[in-house]
Structure formats: C-alpha cells, structure tokens
A protein has these predicted regions:
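Active-site beta->alpha loop and helix N-cap motifs at the rims of alpha/beta catalytic domains
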Residues: 1-59
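Helix-coil boundary/capping segments in enzymes
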Residues: 2, 98-101, 185
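Short, electropositive alpha-helical surface patch
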Residues: 4-12, 66-73, 178-181
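Catalytic alpha/beta core domains of metabolic enzymes, predominantly
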Residues: 39-45, 53-165
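Conserved short secondary-structure transition element at the edge of the structured enzyme core
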Residues: 113-116, 154-192
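Alpha-helix initiation and N-capping motif
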Residues: 129, 168, 184, 199-200
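Long, low-complexity C-terminal extensions of enzymes
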Residues: 197-205
Length: 205
C-alpha cells in the first residue's frame, strides 16, 4: 500500500505498525518499519508513525522512535499519538526536538500544542477540520481570543457526539449529506451504513 501511494508523489504517509500478533518486541516493530521504508525506496517520502495501542495491540515506545530516527533521519519525521497518555506525549515532545508529535485526541490537542506538539490528526477533523486548524494555529494567542475555550469545547463536543455512533459510519453519513453524494455511504462489513442520516439530528445538527 505504501509503495502504491508513493507513486502519487504524496509528501507523507501515516503508517500503523503491523498488528494482530501479540507480545511483539520493539525489535520486531523497528524491523517492520525498516522493511516498509526500504522496500518503498523513496528518499523524499516522509513517514508519520501511528501509535494507537488500544486498537493495534502494539505500542510504539521511545526505543522504537529513537532507533527509527537514527536509521532514517530524513524519513521518519513524526508520530500521531492516540494512546491518550498525555504525560508520554509531553515526554516525546521534550526528548525528540526535531520530531513532530501530533495529538490523536481532540481533547488533548491544545495541551500538546502548548508544550511543543506539532498539531493534531483526529477523526473529527474530517468534519470540523477548519475549527481544529484554528485551535492549533492560534494556541499561542489563546488569551487574546475571547471565545477560544468555547471553540475548544465545541471541538471536543463534536468528537463526543460522533463517537456515540460507530465513528466511520457516522463520518460517512455526515459527508454524504453535506456533499449530497451517496458515494460516501459505500462501506464494507463489519461496518454498516447508517440509515436515514438526514433524519439523525445528532449527527447532522
């Protein structure tokens, strides 16, 4: 997949570690990313690691990050951190100066940015990207923007609302109504299409 995407000359890709297998060692995770990067063979392509251990079952720790940066300093440039562990996120921003840490959580995005994080990559940004972008880009001017905290709370509320449903189905339902395009509702099991999203005020409202 990474090799095919690279053909389109994208600047960066977000890559999960190989998952399904339990008790994978750090060496195994490093070898997985090493093989992906070497087989793609694009010296210009940037890689953003994706740490979401509660879903993948694989945790990307300090040793993995450090070794991959040493092996591929021009390619491994950042990580989306979706573990929800704020202390760990802040340690990463402090320890790896040239490494871009992106919060995978809307509720933690502002705190991470204030402590050296690069921004946020979240599911919610598919439907409220402009709002999240404003929060991230203006976090240093928070005190001079009257409703800044309200905007942050709104972003979190959108996420909470989205995740009262199966999030991918809800995202697709929202986009199908927003763009009046039923192609958004194409979805594969075990995920199911949300029926009559126009009537679901929780999502559309």
């Amino acid at each position: 997949y990474s090799k095919e995407v690279a053909k389109f000359k994208v600047k960066a890709i977000l890559v999960l570690p190989a998952f399904y297998y339990k008790n994978v060692s750090n060496e195994g995770v490093i070898e997985f990313y090493k093989r992906v990067i070497e087989e793609v063979g694009d010296s210009d392509l940037k890689y953003i690691l994706y740490n979401i251990p509660h879903v993948s079952g694989v945790s990307i720790g300090f040793e993995v990050i450090e070794q991959l940066i040493k092996l591929f300093p021009n390619n491994v440039v950042g990580m989306k951190e979706s573990s929800g562990d704020l202390d760990n996120m802040l340690k990463i921003t402090k320890f790896f100066n040239e490494f871009s840490l992106f919060s995978g959580s809307d509720s933690l995005a502002l705190k991470v940015c204030k402590r050296g994080g690069a921004g946020a990559i979240t599911a919610t940004s598919n439907i409220s990207g402009k709002l999240l972008s404003f929060i991230v880009n203006n976090h240093k001017e928070e005190s001079s923007i009257d409703n800044f905290q309200e905007l942050q709370l709104l972003q979190v509320k959108i996420r909470e609302t989205l995740f009262t449903h199966e999030s991918v189905s809800a995202l697709k339902a929202f986009m199908s109504v927003k763009q009046d395009n039923q192609e958004w509702n194409r979805i594969n099991p075990p995920l199911l299409r949300m029926e009559n999203p126009q009537n679901n005020k929780t999502i559309i409202g």
